[in-house]
UniProtKB/Swiss-Prot annotation:
Localization, UniProt: Cytoplasm
Protein name: Myofibril-bound serine protease
Top-level taxon in the UniProt lineage: Eukaryota
GO annotation (BP), single: proteolysis
Enzyme Commission number(s) of this protein: 3.4.21.-
Temperature dependence: Optimum temperature is 35 degrees Celsius. Active from 20 to 70 degrees Celsius.
Keywords, in A-Z order: Cytoplasm, Hydrolase, Protease, Serine protease
Single GO term (MF): serine-type peptidase activity
Organism encoding this protein: Saurida undosquamis (Brushtooth lizardfish)
GO cellular component terms attached to this protein's record: cytoplasm
Length: 22
């Protein structure tokens, strides 16, 4: 998972978290 692209499939809030790296 890089940049939160994969996480978009999980949940929107998590996408932001991974995108920021937190």
């Amino acid at each position: 998972i890089v940049g939160g692209y994969e996480c978009e499939a999980y949940s929107k809030p998590y996408q932001v978290s991974i995108n920021l790296g937190y």
